């Protein structure tokens, strides 16, 4: 990589918190650097869309083994409880799961639709009272779980990829067309699925 490209990339990394369009020069450069073989430092880039707020974020949250605190804070805010505005610090390893899922399905850095991030205890209880499939001790409340889908990727394929990572819990919500991933113990479940779907993966 030339010195001029290195300088430009460095300037992009000085502001990892900005919301970028996927086509912006910085976003393209950071995505390229994260997938170019031979880089000394691997950049971990996430492009997320919040299905409740309509917000998008494109951010490098980790360089090599080092998480970027300011970027994590921006992601935590992005995943806030949209009903109350409350923010919780997330386990950064859940962001690694999202990043690695895009690689596993063959689309590194692809956009991920966020169905649910953080829930306050009161929000979780409210959802449990009127919605089936909401756990009493949900890891969403602990900042360890995210519900998601990926545009253009079959959700069953996404489920298989998440199970293969074996990083924590994986739930498959067939009728709502999303999966749940968390950093708890390794386990799986399939909500309102046929026996064949439950056994798949």
PLM regions and their residue ranges:
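Loop/turn elements at helix/coil->beta-strand transitions in domains of secreted/extracellular proteins
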Residues: 55, 107-112, 166-169, 177
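N-terminal secretory targeting signals
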Residues: 1-48, 194-201
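Active-site acidic/histidine clusters and adjacent loop/turn architecture
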Residues: 63-115
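Extracytoplasmic/lumenal soluble domains of exported proteins with redox or metal-associated functions
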Residues: 56, 60, 71-74, 201
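Extracytoplasmic/secreted envelope proteins and their assembly/folding machinery
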Residues: 72, 95-102, 124, 128, ...
